Amino acid sequence: MRKKKIILATLLILPLSQALAVDCKNAATQQDMSQCANLNYKKADAELNRTYKDLLAKTTVAQRPLLKSAQLTWIKYRDADCTFQSSATEGGSVHPMIISACLTHKTEERTTQLKSFLNCSEGDLSCPL
């Protein structure tokens, strides 16, 4: 019975979420632009998570806690740096968009860095794998 309620609720909410979807190529309002910037960040974060999991799977048992610690430290740095970089817009309607854009940029950079570890040249001593 509970499964049926969950399925029914999902079916009722799904059309609403699609109706609220924003055309990011033609976003005209600040709210729409902020929503699109947040969607871009979510996509970048999903790619980072996939790459991180791929890298984690290739590390040795001894390297795993090192990578986990590095990633958690990087997340704290990213969040703090984006908070600083967006501080001039604090309280303004553009603020969420500026934060999302910063998070997206830094997340894409980190993804590129982690992917480079997955594709190291043979003999590259700076590569952990």
Regions found by a protein language model. Name each.
Residues 1-8:
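Bacterial N-terminal signal peptides that target proteins for export
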Residues 8-10, 74:
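Composition-driven detection of intrinsically disordered, low-complexity segments
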Residues 11-20:
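Hydrophobic h-region of N-terminal signal peptides that target proteins for export
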Residues 19-129:
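N-terminal alpha-helical modules
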